[in-house]
């Protein structure tokens, strides 16, 4: 995934991890309202509703949330979201090239097998580390203040404390199984598709290794990822947000959705998921590639000066 020109120096692992974390946080800040809309649409239809309001479409959900609960509600859970990107995206994206080289061994050109293995490895490790931030983020996004409903949590750190003390510390890792499956799918599809598309565009002289190439590759990766991960993503959101006892397991959550709402329930929130992931990918990958190069140029300048 590292693109270098003749004058570029390959970025170090530290530069890649730092660049991935910063780029992911920037992408999260810009696209977070879409993520909140996605969560609200995904939990809509459960027998236990949060507010009685029906959300319709991406813009309709965002508009309804802003009007009924205030514009700031669109960013509820953002601190946990940024914590998630620092602990999660920085590892799954920043370590991808290094792990790919490990799996590739003596390969002159990384094979599809080594790319997939790298995506599986970095995605799996990142989920276990970042899962508590995901649980808090989803719960803050899902809770409503309407109709006299008392919010479960007043803020990010309050949510961590209440979940750990009233439910158990292990609840912070609730939904790890569907989230692990989701992020293995996302990581493999997103990074491998981006890597393959970018390589094909550059190798066939269709586009240079620059912003237009990164943008197109990120858009294609975003669509493929959303299509494959949507069913698991909806189950993950429902299970994480559910109160104790509503579902006995991840499969029971999936079966409940299937029997009560039908197979289309697994694609609830597809539009905001795609808009969010595609725009997130574009912002993140373009910034990631640019930041890596600028940091290495700055490092070269400092090295030359000394």
UniProtKB/Swiss-Prot annotation:
Membrane topology type = Multi-pass membrane protein
- Say if the entry is tagged with keyword Ion transport: yes
Summarize the activity regulation.
Has no constitutive proton transporter activity and has to be activated by long-chain fatty acids/LCFAs. Inhibited by purine nucleotides. Both purine nucleotides and LCFAs bind the cytosolic side of the transporter and directly compete to activate or inhibit it. Activated by noradrenaline and reactive oxygen species. Despite lacking canonical translational encoding for selenocysteine, a small pool of the protein has been observed to selectively incorporate selenocysteine at 'Cys-253'.
Listed A to Z, the keywords are: Ion channel, Ion transport, Membrane, Mitochondrion, Mitochondrion inner membrane, Oxidation, Repeat, Transmembrane, Transmembrane helix, Transport
Swiss-Prot/TrEMBL GO biological process terms: adaptive thermogenesis; cellular response to fatty acid; cellular response to hormone stimulus; cellular response to reactive oxygen species; mitochondrial transmembrane transport; proton transmembrane transport; regulation of reactive oxygen species biosynthetic process; response to nutrient levels
Q: Which GO terms describe its cellular component?
A: mitochondrial inner membrane
The record describes its post-translational modification as: May undergo sulfenylation upon cold exposure. May increase the sensitivity of UCP1 thermogenic function to the activation by noradrenaline probably through structural effects.
Keyword Transmembrane assigned: yes
- Which reaction is this enzyme known to catalyze? H(+)(in) = H(+)(out)
Q: What is the predominant subcellular site recorded for this chain?
A: mitochondrion
Determine the domain of life of the protein's source: Eukaryota
Q: Name one GO molecular function term.
A: oxidative phosphorylation uncoupler activity
Q: What is the annotated localization of this protein? A: Mitochondrion inner membrane
Which positions does UniProt annotate for fatty acid 16:0 binding?
56, 268
Q: Which Pfam families match?
A: Mito_carr
- Membrane topology, Mitochondrial matrix segments: 33-73, 133-177, 232-265
Q: Gene3D superfamilies from the entry?
A: Mitochondrial carrier domain (1.50.40.10)
Query: For the modification Cysteine sulfenic acid (-SOH), which residues carry it?
Result: 253
Q: Which residues lie on this side of the membrane: Mitochondrial intermembrane?
A: 1-10, 97-115, 195-211, 289-306
Where does the record place its Solcar repeats? Answer: 11-102, 110-200, 209-294
So where does this one cross the membrane? 11-32, 74-96, 116-132, 178-194, 212-231, 266-288
Assembly with partners or alone = Most probably functions as a monomer. Binds one purine nucleotide per monomer. However, has also been suggested to function as a homodimer or a homotetramer. Tightly associates with cardiolipin in the mitochondrion inner membrane; may stabilize and regulate its activity.
Give a short account of what the protein does: Mitochondrial protein responsible for thermogenic respiration, a specialized capacity of brown adipose tissue and beige fat that participates in non-shivering adaptive thermogenesis to temperature and diet variations and more generally to the regulation of energy balance. Functions as a long-chain fatty acid/LCFA and proton symporter, simultaneously transporting one LCFA and one proton through the inner mitochondrial membrane. However, LCFAs remaining associated with the transporter via their hydrophobic tails, it results in an apparent transport of protons activated by LCFAs.
Family statement: Belongs to the mitochondrial carrier (TC 2.A.29) family.
Q: What's the protein name?
A: Mitochondrial brown fat uncoupling protein 1
**Gene field:** UCP1
